[in-house]
Amino acid sequence: MVYDLDMLKAFYASFEKKIGRVRAVLQRPLTLAEKILYTHLYDDALLKKYKRGEDYVNFRPDRVAMQDATAQMALLQFINAGKETVAVPSTVHCDHLIQAYKGAGPDIATATESNREVYDFLRDVSSRFGIGFWKPGAGIIHQVVLENYAFPGGMMVGTDSHTPNAGGLGMVAIGVGGADAVDVMTGMEWELKMPKLIGVHLKGALNGWASPKDVILKLAGILTVKGGTNAIIEYFGEGTASLSATGKATICNMGAEVGATTSLFPYDERMKVYLEATGRKEVAAMADAVSADLQADAEVVADPSAYYDRVIEIDLSELEPYINGPFTPDAATPISEFAEKVLAHGYPRKMEVGLIGSCTNSSYQDLSRAASIARQVDEKQLSVAAPLIVNPGSEQIRATAERDGMIDAFLKIGATIMANACGPCIGQWKRHTDDPLRKNSIVTSFNRNFAKRADGNPNTHAFVASPEVVLALTIAGDLCFNPLKDALINQEGEKVKLRVPEGDELPSTGFTQGNPGYLAPAGAQVEIKVNPESQRLQLLAPFPAWDGKDFTDMPLLIKAQGKCTTDHISMAGPWLRFRGHLENISDNMLMGAVNAFNGETNKVWNRLTNTYEGVSGTAKQYKAEGISSIVVAEENYGEGSSREHAAMEPRFLNVKVILAKSFARIHETNLKKQGMLAVTFIDKADYDKIQEHDLITVSGLADFAPGRNLTVTLHHEDGTQDSFEVQHTYNEQRIGWFRAGSALNAR
């Protein structure tokens, strides 16, 4: 079924004309990203040349997607917007709240019961306001979007940082916070700083054990976790045509791990075949008709350095598998060097669990190639040394994989087939372990591997690889095993080698839908109820407006040391149940951040009691006494998920300022949307001047203006002071949000 066909017809009917107008204004060859961005300006009158990395631009995305953990807060905000229906096609996907424990059937039953209040709320709000609703078990948001909604040349936003997955079908798909999604759903302009462009030239074709996952694992090592910040990664070159649409999606998905605004590939035959295989021949035909404009112009490809801000070249034919980690996705190591790294760093060598699936690697091709490794266990009389967990990406993938024997291949080697949901990838894993703090190693085909993320254990060394490499290491049970060259000892004592993985890009007999789990909206007669006594859901009260004064004598809540992701700021896992209740989820605020003064988590000095207490509890005491506070952090603060709770919680607990060395893009926007002051050090050495007992003043707010620095004064306990300037990236509109108390208040 083709969803929103009228919208798609209108889009493609006007696409060439819009491109023509863009060419007339810019007067130069265009990259694919530019074509999509400039044809999605909020109003034709906005068409002019914008400076990349500097100018803020108003856009009109084509659609919105939300997952159940972030949709709660987004829809609570949408309810307050006073609209009768959404302005653009929108969907909600129930994939984050299902805990992986016993297997798909019992886990979905448990989730349905334990999350009934939240699911009913999301279903009713969706039905009331014209939003498509995908039930628990239907699939992971990004796989379902790729199978049903993504289209070449389009633009979408999603309340999940891995929304760029849709770039595998040539779409500019951007992860945002809920407040941004509300802007789009209410028909307002959606603002974004015009991204810089990183061009990645792909040459050759993959071979052997190398997979699309290895392209982005290698690139993560080149760019690091913040190298793509405020940039779009655009892939081009002859190598792109050798990759399947789902392989392209894998690469775009993990662009989030380098901080990229989004990633995308040019339209080609592989995308066309995928659209047709997923029941969208009509969409493929419309894209074919404008295919010349669904890729970078020939002049761009011929001289990329003249059009991209940075160009990186990767030869696919020379690429080997990578294994990234632990604790950060940019710790990239080719498999030929990985054993040496494991031994040199003393990582736990024993591979304890292999996990495949997630939104990054759960396509038909992924499972097909992994199953080809699993089948060799019986064929070569091997034993499997570690447990295997499989999360299919959607019900369509699961049902088709079951029909084609892949699920059986996994079950035969002892795998547990979990729900078509995120599960362990976002911390929804009730792991079978007798010691939750034991030092151990796991390897996954997921996208992130932050400490505590998968199972809550800070000593779990999580590594990221392709599904086929995960399978090989699961069989071996040894991180030092290299399937490209090492042999295994089978049950007969013989040395055997695993064959190179193989698998079909798409099912030769077509997909089978299984039980798709889609619920179309019913309309305005649906009543929305929120129990005021609920511990899961809470209607939102507006945040107070700025009082017109400088922030004076604020105690330091925490000076965070090292990596401070959204997982550190607002943990997922068991806390997901409170994602619709701001007061309750605020109890986890910054509990994972490391205090620079004692090296501990969730233990900060409380000025009121002169004792060390939890971060949230301390902030609550300050709030109760009418005291504002400040958080100080290092680089790339807010890296990771799009969850706006990481911005709303400090706002709710009266934290006024986040002062960091740098911010991750989505989180910085989320802070601004909630009326927070997000500023950065001009001289990063000033971070070291901040002392634990300081009272901190931020002045200059009466003259708050774009490009004008603010002043921070540190009042030290010994009576001395330090003062320095800090910078910000607020424009006039965002300063308006700050003054109003939030973007919603400023409507």
Where are these regions (language model features)?
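Accessory "access/gating" subregions that flank catalytic or transport cores
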Residues: 109-113, 118, 123-127, 131-157, ...
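Flexible inter-domain linker/hinge segments
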Residues: 5-7, 16-21, 27, 36-42, ...
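Acidic, glycine-rich flexible loop/linker segments
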Residues: 488-505, 667-737, 744-746
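Extracellular/luminal Protease-associated
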Residues: 236-241, 624-663
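Extended active-site and interfacial segments that coordinate phosphate-rich ligands
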Residues: 167-195, 467, 569-588, 651-656, ...
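Mobile "lid/hinge" segments at catalytic clefts and subdomain interfaces of large enzymes
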Residues: 3-4, 68, 151-285, 382, ...
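Long, structured ligand/cofactor-binding scaffold of large enzymes
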Residues: 8-11, 15, 20-195, 579-631, ...
